[in-house]
């Protein structure tokens, strides 16, 4: 009994139809107006009418179909749509008979009749506000055409009209600059850059790293003297003193004003035998500025063998508080000549210092201590005139924080024909002193990393036997 009931329930479930959609509801209402009994003709005619309906009519039937679905859900809560499987046997397509064109023509007649009846109804009804959608549907209704192939010419013409009515894209032709115009534009840009204020800075970036390379005052400088050389010899970080003095005929005009006795500065002059004949600036007016102070001469980057023409002259122990050798005043620390032997003007005395690099600041011995991690502390005081009043060293600072290399430096620079291999043992002793140095001084104790210091980390001009 239960099995039979379940079979009946299954039959009832299978017999439940789907709820009608908006088009089917529209077809149910308009089907009575069509006199034809052919379902294909009815579907074609009603489909054409549905496409020409206004949005209000379509919205009405869509709301009606939503109510129909809710009603169907209440009546059949267990209903679930399962699409039917297609049969494996394919049906053969029936050939269109020549008589099929006759009832298609009848469809046109029916559409024209429906359009005429709608016009007569509108004429009898009172006038209403004009609706654009209804007017468009009324205009399209009599002009409908339905070809045999099933494709509407109306769609094709609408596509063509859309293509023709689309706005044309104007091709704006930009006149390209000729080569002469580009050159003139570049020249005018460079002329403007020369007139730009010097306060404007331009940064350049490296193409590989992306970091800024440097800063220049302007792209093109009309005054070439504003370009500072790479290796500046000035102590205050300004334009190089030697470069300025080489451009002026008078040597005493650009000397520092805070120096007490600038004319008493002595300039060493070497004769053909190699002896030093000192002579003041006032006694040698024929000495040109470019020979006295020359910074633009080529500089050899390789360490050359130092040679001193006079063996009796040796560098003195520095009496400065910093490792660059400046006494606090404006110091004219520029070399007198570029070469292996370089003389520096310092105070009122002429101190000869032999260094392979002309850009090394005076004195070289203090730079050795700065590179090795130790500092030279001096008790000398500096006055406004730039001269040291007290030239004494504190014994405790000298014993704790300073490596005495006077004996080594005298033997190092006294011989004119110096060979690095001959003094390799002395260099090793010096490096061993720096490496094994220990002190309780707070300045030296804060530099514990000096134990890992090797000869390669010292100043580049320091002789090293491993390089040769």
Swiss-Prot record:
Determine the domain of life of the protein's source: Eukaryota
| PTM description | Phosphorylation results in inactivation.
Spans annotated as Disordered = 1-21, 249-290
Q: Which Pfam families match?
A: HMG_box
**UniProt keyword terms in alphabetical order:** Activator, Cytoplasm, DNA-binding, Nucleus, Phosphoprotein, Stress response, Transcription, Transcription regulation
Per its UniProt record, what InterPro entries does this chain match?
Answer: HMG_box_dom, HMG_box_dom_sf, SOX_TF
Output a single Gene Ontology CC term carried by this record: nucleus
Which residue stretches does the UniProt record annotate as biased composition, category Polar residues? Answer: 249-263, 274-285
Q: Which residues carry this modification: Phosphothreonine?
A: 173
* Protein name, as recorded: Transcription factor ste11
Residues within the DNA-binding region(s): 16-80
Predominant place of localization: nucleus
């Amino acid at each position: 009994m239960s099995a039979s009931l379940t079979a009946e329930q299954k039959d009832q479930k299978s017999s439940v139809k789907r709820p009608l959609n908006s088009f089917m509801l529209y077809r149910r209402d308009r089907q009575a107006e069509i006199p034809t009994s052919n379902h294909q003709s009815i579907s074609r005619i009603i489909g054409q009418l549905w496409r020409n309906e206004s949005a209000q009519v379509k919205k009405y039937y869509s709301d009606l179909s939503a109510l129909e679905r809710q009603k169907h859900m209440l009546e059949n809560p267990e209903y679930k749509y399962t699409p039917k499987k297609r049969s494996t046997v394919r049906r053969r397509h029936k050939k269109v008979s020549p008589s099929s064109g006759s009832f298609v023509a009848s469809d046109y007649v029916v559409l024209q009749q429906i359009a005429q009846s709608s016009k007569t109804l509108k004429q009898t009804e009172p006038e209403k506000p004009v609706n654009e959608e209804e007017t468009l549907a009324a205009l399209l209704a009599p002009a409908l055409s339905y070809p045999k192939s099933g494709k509407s010419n109306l769609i094709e013409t609408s596509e063509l009209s859309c293509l023709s009515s689309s706005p044309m894209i104007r091709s704006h032709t930009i006149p390209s600059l000729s080569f002469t115009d580009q050159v003139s534009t570049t020249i005018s840009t460079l002329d403007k850059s020369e007139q730009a204020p010097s306060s404007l800075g331009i940064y350049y970036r490296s193409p590989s790293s992306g970091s800024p390379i440097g800063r220049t005052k302007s792209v093109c400088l009309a005054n070439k003297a504003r370009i500072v050389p790479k290796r500046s010899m000035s102590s205050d970080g300004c334009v190089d003193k030697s470069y300025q003095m080489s451009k002026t005929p008078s040597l005493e005009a650009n000397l520092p004003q805070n120096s007490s006795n600038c004319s008493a500065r002595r300039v060493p002059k070497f004769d053909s035998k190699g002896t030093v004949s000192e002579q003041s600036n006032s006694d040698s007016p024929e000495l040109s500025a470019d020979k006295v102070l020359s910074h633009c001469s080529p500089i050899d980057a390789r360490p050359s063998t130092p040679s001193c023409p006079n063996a009796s002259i040796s560098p003195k122990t520095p009496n400065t508080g910093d490792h660059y050798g400046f006494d606090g005043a404006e110091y004219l620390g520029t070399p007198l000549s570029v070469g292996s032997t370089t003389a520096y003007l310092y105070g009122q005395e002429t101190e000869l210092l032999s260094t392979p690099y002309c850009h090394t600041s005076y004195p070289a011995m203090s730079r050795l201590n700065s590179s090795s991690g130790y500092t030279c502390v001096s008790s000398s005081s500096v006055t406004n005139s730039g001269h040291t009043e007290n030239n004494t060293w504190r014994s405790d600072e000298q014993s704790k924080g300073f490596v005495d290399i006077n004996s080594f430096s005298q033997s190092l620079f006294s011989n004119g024909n110096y060979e690095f291999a001959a003094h390799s043992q002395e260099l090793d002793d010096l490096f061993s002193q720096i490496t094994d140095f220990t002190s309780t001084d707070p300045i030296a104790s804060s530099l514990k990393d000096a134990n890992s210091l090797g000869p390669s980390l010292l100043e580049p001009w320091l002789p090293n036997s491993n390089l040769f």
